[in-house]
UniProtKB/Swiss-Prot annotation:
The keyword Translocase does not apply. Residues 175-177 are annotated as: G5. Its EC number is 3.6.5.3. This is Elongation factor Tu. The gene is tuf. GTP hydrolase that promotes the GTP-dependent binding of aminoacyl-tRNA to the A-site of ribosomes during protein biosynthesis. It comes from Lactobacillus helveticus (strain DPC 4571).
Length: 396
């Protein structure tokens, strides 16, 4: 049996993706980037059909087609997300299946910004993609350079409209198809694009550098030692002796100190993002901590009942609802590890939400949850997933 390739972490890692209107060349650009970098020995060339036949993934009960390619520049290691269909993009961005540190917005110079261009920019803004680099594609098909200048101005205005620094965002012009076909000048523009991405999109703060957060999945007692809360560490690190807070489902925040940590039945000095651990808590009774709460670094997260959310509602074919819903709809919101009933209030001018819609609304929970801007959730009804979303604004 062949040994698995070991991932060697020598360069900083950044997650990016291509966004933009259908047929503007997102997948062609993805293929062109890998092809051009492959010539420098920094990537494996992926052809269009490989990327376009994206495998299905399940993220929190929702099926999404996503292609992931990886490549390197001289400075960084990139994981690049590309989704074949428009609905896949929306689901990807809202469920956080592909958490992007930055995005390459692809706009065809032949068309200019189109409806999905706008929708993707809005979504990127809502889900916290703070850095966008623009690639004006198909420039070889436009004879008059002044027309390309006009398209660039339109794109900059559109970005400004959604609170991006439209005047300062870097714009690179080129032709992804020509680069794929081996045109030297077009390939130079692809390298210029990647240099721009290297420079403009900052290296993200690593998950381990963020404040500790662990959703509690299970609670048990070790006789003579105390109460253990177990779960997967979402972010940050925790070590024996750390002070933590138990937050969520009740208004009162409990404080405790970590007196022991174990993973796979072995004791541990410290745990970090991604680890499944049991955390022994000093002075906490078995019934004072429950599934659905979180353990967190003191002061790092609070409970809230009311928030605004950006949501994708599943279609009937995806196992979602068969009928629309209206304001006052009361499903369960599954946060971290538990369901909390909440009432939905649709924005003014929205009568109802149809299966398949991507929408924004306000939620009021019947119990407080440990949430913040960017917290992901699914919407469930009788145990089945009918939607997925994330918190875009806290309202209380």
């Amino acid at each position: 049996m062949a040994e698995k390739e070991h991932y060697v972490r020598t360069k900083p890692h950044v997650n990016i993706g291509t966004i933009g209107h259908v047929d503007h060349g997102k997948t062609t650009l993805t293929a062109a980037i890998t092809t051009v970098l492959a010539e420098k020995g920094l990537a494996k060339a992926e052809d269009y059909s490989q990327i376009d036949a994206a495998p299905e993934e399940k993220e929190r009960g929702i099926t999404i087609n996503t292609a992931h390619v990886e490549y390197e520049t001289e400075k960084r290691h990139y994981a690049h997300m590309d989704a074949p269909g428009h609905a896949d993009y929306i689901k990807n961005m809202i469920t956080g299946a592909a958490q992007m540190d930055g995005a390459i917005l692809v706009v065809a110079a032949t068309d200019g910004p189109m409806p999905q261009t706008r929708e993707h920019i809005l979504l990127a803004r809502q889900v916290g993609v703070n850095y966008i680099v623009v690639f004006l594609n198909k420039c070889d098909l436009v004879d008059d350079p002044e027309l390309i200048d006009l398209v660039e101005m339109e794109v900059r205005d559109l970005l400004t409209e959604y609170d991006y620094p439209g005047d300062d965002i870097p714009v690179v012009r080129g032709s992804a198809l020509k680069a794929l076909e081996g045109d030297k000048e077009a390939q130079e523009q692809i390298l210029k694009l990647m240099d721009t991405v290297d420079e403009y999109i900052p290296t993200p703060e690593r998950q381990t550098d963020k404040p500790f957060l662990m959703p509690v999945e299970d609670v048990f007692t070790i006789t003579g030692r105390g109460t253990v809360a177990s779960g997967r560490i979402d972010r940050g690190t925790v070590k024996v002796g750390d002070e933590v807070e138990i937050v969520g489902l009740v208004d009162k925040v409990l404080k405790s100190v970590v007196t022991g940590l174990e993973m796979f039945h072995k004791t541990l000095d410290s745990g970090e993002a991604g680890d499944n651990v049991g955390v022994l808590l000093r002075g906490i009774d078995r019934d004072q901590v429950v599934r659905g709460q979180v353990l967190a670094a003191p002061g790092s997260i609070q409970t809230h009942n009311k928030f605004k959310a950006q949501v994708y509602v599943l279609k009937k074919e995806e196992g979602g609802r068969h009928t629309p819903f209206f304001s006052d709809y009361r499903p369960q919101f599954y946060f971290h590890t538990t369901d909390i009933t909440g009432e939905i209030e649709l924005p003014e001018g929205t009568e109802m939400v149809m299966p398949g819609d991507n929408t924004e609304f306000t939620v009021t929970l019947i119990k407080p949850a440990a949430i913040e801007k960017g917290t992901k959730f699914t919407i469930r009804e009788g145990g089945r997933t009918v939607g997925a979303g994330q918190v875009t604004e806290i309202l209380d």
